[in-house]
From Swiss-Prot:
It comes from Yersinia enterocolitica serotype O:8 / biotype 1B (strain NCTC 13174 / 8081). It is found in: Cytoplasm. This is Thiazole synthase. The active site is at residue 95. It catalyses: [ThiS sulfur-carrier protein]-C-terminal-Gly-aminoethanethioate + 2-iminoacetate + 1-deoxy-D-xylulose 5-phosphate = [ThiS sulfur-carrier protein]-C-terminal Gly-Gly + 2-[(2R,5Z)-2-carboxy-4-methylthiazol-5(2H)-ylidene]ethyl phosphate + 2 H2O + H(+). One of its GO terms (cellular component) is cytoplasm. Its main location: cytoplasm. Keywords: Cytoplasm, Schiff base, Thiamine biosynthesis, Transferase. It comes from the Bacteria. Catalyzes the rearrangement of 1-deoxy-D-xylulose 5-phosphate (DXP) to produce the thiazole phosphate moiety of thiamine. Sulfur is provided by the thiocarboxylate moiety of the carrier protein ThiS. In vitro, sulfur can be provided by H(2)S. Homotetramer. Forms heterodimers with either ThiH or ThiS.
């Protein structure tokens, strides 16, 4: 079980809605993922149309929608998008994204913190996408964010946990859930994040662009569940300086030597 703000989730796999070939394929994949929190970009939603191709099908799934402010380049733009989402969708949850750099889509730490402080004061449940910066994540936590979402690698890169060392620090010191977001390109990456101690992962591109998005979504679901089960079972300590035999020697060999000398 994972609790963020006032909501409990049984799945630690969060998913996105971008890059799918069709809305029907998106829905099939999201169902296969078992995800209960699905993020969507406000810039892609037609709020004037009651039968929006993205929004209408998502509402049928019965999951929590997490509108994001992707496309915002400043705190002011992000706050405006969050307010618009609350009014249009009736949710006070928001994934805060501010990335002015259109090439690498790296989050702006200064604008993100500024927007987070404003939105928290306005009653939003804020989940900020941010760099894997332990100091920034702590500041966002102190500002009242319900979780932090540090990147594993640049958005859509599928490179995995390139920020692993910093993620470990963030996880170790966080008092709110840590959701690894961006760069997760394979189920093994998601498994690694959960085993590392992350509370959840958010995956979009790796599922949407797969040859079979439905099968890939199911694979990610199994990977995350496997990682959670492994953590519950208790992972063994790692040894770097020596090996430890799985079957320690007893007096067995000594007894054989004595018998050979008789």
């Amino acid at each position: 079980m994972l609790k963020i703000a006032d909501t409990t989730f049984t799945s630690r796999l969060f998913t996105g809605t971008g890059k799918f070939a069709t809305a029907e394929l998106m829905l099939e994949a999201l169902r296969a993922s078992g995800s209960q929190l699905i993020t969507m970009a406000m810039k892609r939603v037609d709020l004037q149309a009651g039968n929006d191709a993205i929004l209408a099908p998502l509402r049928q799934l019965g999951v929590r929608l997490l509108p994001n402010t992707s496309g915002a380049k400043t705190a002011q733009e992000a706050v405006f998008a969050a307010r618009l989402a609350r009014e249009a969708l009736g949710t006070h949850w928001v994934k805060l994204e501010i990335h002015p750099d259109v090439k690498y889509l790296l989050p702006d730490p200064i604008e993100t913190l500024k927007a987070a402080e404003i939105l928290v004061k306005e009653g939003f449940v804020v989940l900020p996408y941010c760099g894997a910066d332990p100091v920034l994540c702590k500041r966002l936590e102190e500002a009242g964010c319900a979780a932090v979402m540090p990147l594993g690698a640049p958005i859509g890169s599928n490179l995995g946990l390139r920020t692993r060392d910093f993620l470990q620090i963030i996880i170790a010191q966080a008092k709110v859930p840590v959701v690894v977001d961006a760069g997760i390109g394979a189920p093994s990456h998601a498994l690694e994040a959960i085993e590392l101690g992350a509370d959840a992962v958010l995956v979009n591109t790796a599922i949407a662009v797969a040859r079979s998005p439905v099968k890939m979504a199911h694979a990610f679901r199994l990977a995350v569940e496997s990682g959670e089960l492994a953590c519950q079972a208790g992972l063994g300590n790692r040894q770097f300086d020596r090996a430890i035999a799985t079957s320690p020697l007893t007096g067995f060999l000594s007894q054989l030597e004595e018998e050979n000398h008789v």
